[in-house]
Amino acid sequence: MSSIVRLSGITVRNLKNITVEFCPREIVLFTGVSGSGKSSLAFNTIYAAGRKRYLATLPSFFATKLDSLPDPSVKKIEGLSPTVAVKQNFFEQHIHATVGSTTEINSYLALLFSLEGQAYDPVTLHPLTLYSKEKILSEIAAIPDGTQLTLLAPLPARDVLTVRECLRQGFTKVLIDEEVVPIHKFLTTGIPVPGQLIVDTLIKNTSNTPRLKVSLFTTLDIGHGECSLHFDNQKRVFSTQATLPETQQTYAPLSPDLFSSHSHKDRCPQCQGSGIFISIDDPCIIQQTLSIEDNCCPFAGNCSTFLYRTIYQSLADSLGFSLSTPWQNLSPEIQHIFLYGKEGLSIPVKLFDGTLGKKTQTHKQWKGVLNEIGEKIRFSNKPARYLPKGTSYTVCPRCNKTGLSDYANATRWHGKSFADFQQMSLQELFIFLNQLPEKELAIEEVIQGFKSRLTILIDLGLPYLSPERAIDTLSGGERERTALAKHLGAELIGVMYILDEPSIGLHPQDTHKLMNVIRRLRDQGNTVLLVEHDEQMISLADRVIDIGPGAGIFGGEVVFNGSPREFLAKSDSLTAQYLRQEQHISVPAKRTNSLGTITLSKANKHNLKDLTVSIPLGQMTVVTGVSGSGKSSLINDTLVPCVEEFIEQGFCSTLSIQGALSRLVHINRDLPGRSQRSIPLTYIKAFDEVRQLFAEQPRCKTLGLTKSHFSFNTPLGACAECGGLGSITTTDNRDSITCPSCLGKRFLPQVLEVRYKNKTIADILEMTAYEAKNFFLDEPSIHQKIETLCTLGLQYLPLGRPLYSLSGGEIQRLKLAYELLAPVKHPTLYVLDEPTTGLHTHDVKQLIYVVQSLIHQGHSVIIIEHNMHVVKVADYILELGPEGGNKGGYLIASCSPEELIHKHTPTAIALRPFLSSPQELPYLPDPSPKPPVPAAITIANAHQHNLKHIDLSIPRYALTAVTGPSASGKHSLVFDILHAAGNIAYAELFPPYIRQALIKKTPLPAVDKVTGLSPVIAIEKTSASRNSNHSVASALEISEMLESLFTRIGHPYSPISGDTLRTISPETIAEELLTHYTKGYVTITVPFPKEEEFFSYTQEMLQEGFLKLYANEQFYDLDGPFPTSLENPALVIHHVKILEKNLPSLLASLTLAFSKASSVCLHIEYAGTSLSKTYRQGLQDASGNLFPNIETPSILNHESYLCPLCHGKGFLSTCSILPHKKRFAQHTPISLFTSLFPNQDPSPIYPLLNELGIPSIALFQEIDILSFESLCLGTQQHLGLNALCTKAMLMESEEDFPPDLISKTPCNQCQGLGVYTYKHCTRIHSISLSEIYQSNVAFLKKLLLSVEEEPSLVQDILSRLDLLDRVGLGYVILGQEQQSLSDGEHYRLLLAKAFSSGLTDVIYLLEDPLAGIHPEDAPCLLAVIKKLVTNHNTVIVTDREGSLAEHADYLLHLGPEPGPNGGYLLSTSALKQSQPVLCNTRSSEETPQLSVSVSTSTIQIENLAFPLQRLSTISGVSGSGKTTLLNSIYEHGCAILEKDPSVFSEIIFLDSYPQIASSRSDISTYFDIAPSLRNFYASLTQAKALNISVSMFSPNTKQGQCSDCWGLGYQWIDRAFYAMEKRPCPTCGGFRVQPLIQEVVYEGKHFGQLLQASLNEVAETFSFLKKIQKPLHTLITNDLGYLSLGQNMASLSLSEKIAIKLTKHLFLPPKHPTLFLLDEIATSLDNQQQSALLVQLNTLVSLGHTVVIIENHPAFSQQADFWIQMGRKTDNHILFAGPNPNLSFT
């Protein structure tokens, strides 16, 4: 077994080709100075590799739900398991984020409310009742017998069609205003007012019960779920929707969406979900005489910007008003909608999509400008910053801050509203859930998941938080722990958790709670990797890996890797030196004196207990306390706003200041910019100076470049391909790859020609702050700004790194650096919130030095902090506590550190060791033995399908074979239970929307509990679908990787001349102009975008400074006027004379033009002539032929780059009628064409018919063979029927065309690749993609071993090629379509795909992996399976034949019989299965023969003759051509069938795939048993009395099926992000038919019960129905009598489906001679079924039929009359073909 995780050759970011090793199930602590490479190793390498490998094995719809990580640059990875990461993402919180939404508590609550909530009418608060049909019947049943009942259905007014339909159905009366009126009076007008149709009047008694049911269901159908019942002067109204009888108001059923304030449909109509109502106090705030266009509302978005102009114009268009209308002239309704929105108002808007790079149509929900502001206020910790002057806000009076609709707010669950739960603390919520009575299983599962999530949050020290608390108001530590809680609830084993400084924000007292949670994860059997600086956490670690020795370029090496004790004793790293106190942060010898005091009173925000605190000025004050004690509430939410108010207004009622203070700098963790374009160099205002420096270089002036060209944020200098980002997102897995155009440099080539001190502008951005500080020594201003970064411990930070990728601590230090750069003379108060986040102790020392320098300058600093190194150097300490939440909010200490350690507060206890002399070393407990990992997967009370409530254990890290007869429960156990439970458990690690996608098709398994699970990968044969568009290479993503490799390092060549292609760029165009048109003039234009509105685009371009437009071969001013018609309008970029000195201007203009459009048109005036030339960026050969740019990632999957002939499919579809003459015997050529293409004209067929002399009314059966062939293939003058049908098919959807009429051939133009021909000419080492796809694994391996570039990608491809070799598919052509593979090859390809992840600690579930495999192929596949176990995985296989029994480590045998008599766990060792032993007793006399020839790339056979009326077996290794030979026999057989039907009258081809079944297919319909039984039931007296027709005895007709479950007998209960639950339909009781049908009974069974009866029972009960006895008897003979008559085909096991298929076609054979072709049909059968099959095959032969079967089982070869042994994969011929040498004939 793999006992180590090893990653070698890591070169990610600054990591220097390092190798890292650690053991599974360890807590590994990554430490080192800030910027040393810890996160690069943990997240960008280990996490990225583990996650990507596992996601690749999941369904693609799930893998694409997550933003894929790029492949890390690692040479080799061993022992990695699936990974889950928890990173610091404080700045990524959505504006609406609350504790409830972030931790998914709201999702749990919404689900429970929807499943169990009681709805109430919001106005009357009366409970709403949703009546099911059976509940209505039970209500009516309570009415005394003998009562007259009248059933009525609501009827709309003025609806003539409804009146006519009612008359047609036989209804005669309508109730209008309490008066009964004949309905025929309203035949032409409809009823004048809403009324009620009288459906039936009857006396309630037993004999009328069936009639009552019929009438009730009819009434509900007519009334769309509503009906009225009149009796004894009473009126009752029923509805299948939630309805209040008093008001008749109807409400939708409860759903999770109803309890979300973001739901467009269900949010509060007044505040539009914000929960806040903003009122306008100053009537003059809106300027009445101005219009919206003139910005009459100062708090609305500026209408002069393109964004808001577009939105407001769309709103105006939707509501029918003008933006230029003064506000006072707008109607009150329009004014209200503009300010407060309108319920359900959605407006179409065309906005720019940064992902697509163009404007796209979208829809915006219009909430109103004030409600948009309200959303920001509700979730902000500083509401005042968003509140416009002249307005005030209150809680929304309608929804009371919930943002929910009235209906949602009125709903109760266990007596409480949704808002009640939002206001509870997490501890109170947990207690409430614990007190609930036990629920049914489906509800209990949700509640247990809910409690598990709450338990983790409480264990992490957050019991005091409430779900409604906004994330923006939490401290940094609280945010980190809410994020952490989402990931720690799954009970999986073998997962690698990677945590990013989980101790952030935790007080030392709380850290032990976190440590317990992490220790529990490890003890559960997982690996935990921590990126940490907290000295306490070292006592938790099993291993320490120190990365360093320095930061940035000075780090990236493994300094130490070993136990914590060895680390302290032996390591010389900075971390170890600080831990041993060889280096330390000194306590100041003397504390700074106070310069004044800030006194804050009545602080009561959140949990603060009306505090009064005094904070000294001129000192460093640290605010500390346990988590949740109120630190952020005191400083960020109370003190900061008060100080701001005091400074602005000179007064604050709750604040007084004694001393000088004139400025406040609040440095929080908020991201200063979310754009990828915000970088440290721009933030500290140094980039402008750097750009100016480059603009002053001589080369810059030569090229005509300005300062603007050195910005990657403008099109003048930014790379046009990536827009200045340096990277682009490819369509293969959305990986972000280096831009192939600028190679990550961000800028255009001409910009990079300019150098300063031999460095380009791109080189500057790649420098770290340390490198740049030394580089700019000669530029004092730039040097000073960058040196400030180094002073604050950011020396490792690359100057061009996007700000969004920084941690919270890095952001604060960057902000502090910016503040330090501004010379401040006035006394300033600096407020910092945990600035040590992400800092090593060595960097904390530098930070303290900076803070103390501010103090020495006379400023004041307040720091919220838990780091004891900072606390010990503080001048003054405020400690809040004593606990978190409601038990916190008190001031428990306010003194110096020396005074604090004599108190008994949590901080005092933590601080004492740091003030002791000498300081104590960290406590390292003795290593304790880790609890053993569960040795087994335990399953309790498994009762899926026929499993008999079994309990069992399956060993982990072993190969377990589950054996037993077919349908004994093997598939139910392995796939329906283990796979489902594993999927559900792994999904717990993800947010609800991703979880929902993964488990939406995973039904809740019928089992009490499954423990000991790891992430699961399952491969079922029944789900092994094939896609003809996919090749062998694409199955393992080899094709995508090759595409990426060719994109990155391939060299394009011209497909015409073979010359190297040159790039079309501004430089090449300018060069061409100077070469051929010197001294001429050129006008550079770009076409107007077709999707843009003309006027808005011209206005936009005018604002950008453009002046002219070119159209109709002349120029116009861009501001008009224009003629009525403009032909091909184009924007004029520049007009310039073509001279060498104007080259810079030409380059700049062409660059700008290409940034505006993909094509540029040049209008050239030269030597008295005018010409126009159009250029597109791309590639060009020497002859001027243009090709798309091969370097662009779009080439991977973009419509414009596809082969124009086959449109990217790689094949051409043609219609072939020729082989189907017999099938269409009753058609004429015209009738066939019109039936296939009813919307197309058949007239082109007539000339062909005239030429061939075929009457247009001639049937195909009347046309001779030669004429039919000419009709299909055509003549020299006219297209044939094949070509005409192909042409018609291409004009419509190919998907709607019968697939068996379509013939697919590889596209000649693209050689089957589906892309432009020139792409084939892109080569690596002279080898093209097409050559690779036409070769095998060995060819590609040889090429890749010679490639030195992209080592990580090359290694990935090689590993997958190696896997193809290991599963025995090394011989397969990489471009071969999957559908052309044999069954064995295809299944092994699926295995290879699953095994390609290379992961450990995974459970692999395989379905009969050796079934049907040739003995020579079995060892290689068995070796791969064994290798999986060796690599520390668990493999569980189903094994029908027992072929794996001798190789398995553990055996489970289920049985003893199939179906109801199976499902028992018989033993944990396989029972020996008997092998079929039969004797062939046929005579050896000769029979007619069929001769075939085959010539393909894989097999060459000439004139193979095999006997008819005999059993022939084809055997051989996978890939030897068995299926190809069988297909050839089929084609030859079809040809013979056309010419001479006497040889055999039919051909039946059966493969190993089960019959395709819908949700309605069952045994009774498949074998045509149901019609006879329906006729019988319809003939019964009861049926006639109730007027029930034959068709009503069917669950598949509208009249007969239960209308609530549509005849399925069950309903799916959607539990949102939990697995779907399948429940019997309550209306029909699971019997599928409507209640009326259940009134007709025969032998104690109604028709629904009959469908649930076994075939044995049906055969015995209806022995007199001779027509159904044969199929029933045959099914029973084949041991399928236990199946129920209405058994759904989709619910059968694979072996049962195959047995059904065989029964239909082989055991109920045709009467005339038939050719049976069977392709590995026996591989899904157990040995007993195989014996029965052999008996039947011999019976068929004795009846004169011919059987040819592909089968490697020895018993079939031994019984065959004729044996064909195929050669090895590379032989291309037959080893043996002749009479069976082992068979002695009688």
Swiss-Prot record:
Gene Ontology cellular-component annotations: cytoplasm; excinuclease repair complex
Secreted keyword on record: no
GO molecular function: ATP binding; ATP hydrolysis activity; DNA binding; nuclease activity; zinc ion binding
Amino-acid positions noted as binding ATP in the UniProt annotation, renumbered to this chain: 32-39, 964-971, 1516-1523
ABC transporter domain span: 314-580, 590-913
Keyword vocabulary terms for this entry: ATP-binding, Cytoplasm, DNA damage, DNA excision, DNA repair, DNA-binding, Excision nuclease, Metal-binding, Nucleotide-binding, Repeat, SOS response, Zinc, Zinc-finger
Localization: Cytoplasm
PROSITE patterns per record: ABC_TRANSPORTER_2
Binding locations of ATP 1: 410-417
Biological processes per GO annotation: nucleotide-excision repair; SOS response
Pfam families the record matches: UvrA_DNA-bind, UvrA_inter
Residues involved in ATP 2 binding: 625-632
Zinc finger (C4-type): 719-742, 1602-1628
Family that this chain belongs to: Belongs to the ABC transporter superfamily. UvrA family.
Quaternary structure (record): Forms a heterotetramer with UvrB during the search for lesions.
Primary role: The UvrABC repair system catalyzes the recognition and processing of DNA lesions. UvrA is an ATPase and a DNA-binding protein. A damage recognition complex composed of 2 UvrA and 2 UvrB subunits scans DNA for abnormalities. When the presence of a lesion has been verified by UvrB, the UvrA molecules dissociate.
NCBIfam families named in the record: PRK00635.1, uvra
Full protein name: UvrABC system protein A
Organism this protein belongs to: Chlamydia trachomatis serovar D (strain ATCC VR-885 / DSM 19411 / UW-3/Cx)
